[in-house]
Amino acid sequence: MVKSFLIDLFDGHLIFENDGLKVLVDTGCPVTIGKSTHFDFMGQSYQCMTEFGGKGIAEISAMMGYDIDVFMGMNIIEQFHIETDYQSKEITFSTEEIPFDSICSIPIIRGRMGEVCIDLTVKGQNIKLALDTGARISYIDESFTNGEPVVETRDDFNPMIGNFSTPIYSMEASVCEQIFPVNFGKLPPVMAMPLKMMGIYGAIGFDLFNAFTVLMDFKKNMLSLKCNT
């Protein structure tokens, strides 16, 4: 089964509509959060939590400034092959492999705590970053931003800690020898410390998906890329 949806990139968030419900896709969350305890999608009914970390859909929507109905996490996402094309504003879910003429494929690294990561190169160092479709701002450990000029300050939120502000650093990252621009923020210490203990140096979100058409194959744990022209 395969189905494509138009996406609404509200402030960099990956959102689509399914049967009248606004759905935010977030590979950074292990569970799905909804207004009810189930979500019908692609011919299946999936379990939802009504709260995660003490936050429900109403609280998440308020932090975003956008009303969503479902916060789709990895318990649903990992069931599919998913292609995102931000230039065409389209996301495709498939239960079968999706034909994809990629420039390269890299492993998706799955952690014991449910984290989903990939390796990128920043400032000549190969580092592990969380792959987060829900992140409108990418983040990196402050050791990489030392000496970099702050280009602006932006507001962001995390369902676990609420709203916060971060300085933004305009930098570059590379994958498969392809260089792309990234506006990195600085993670709050409460988020940075546990990630670093797992060898994770931040999170890559909107910037990667805006630079490439991306195929996430969670059956084989591979991520494939095509350059957006």
Language-model features, listed with the residues they occupy:
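Pepsin/retropepsin-fold aspartyl endopeptidases
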Residues: M1-T229
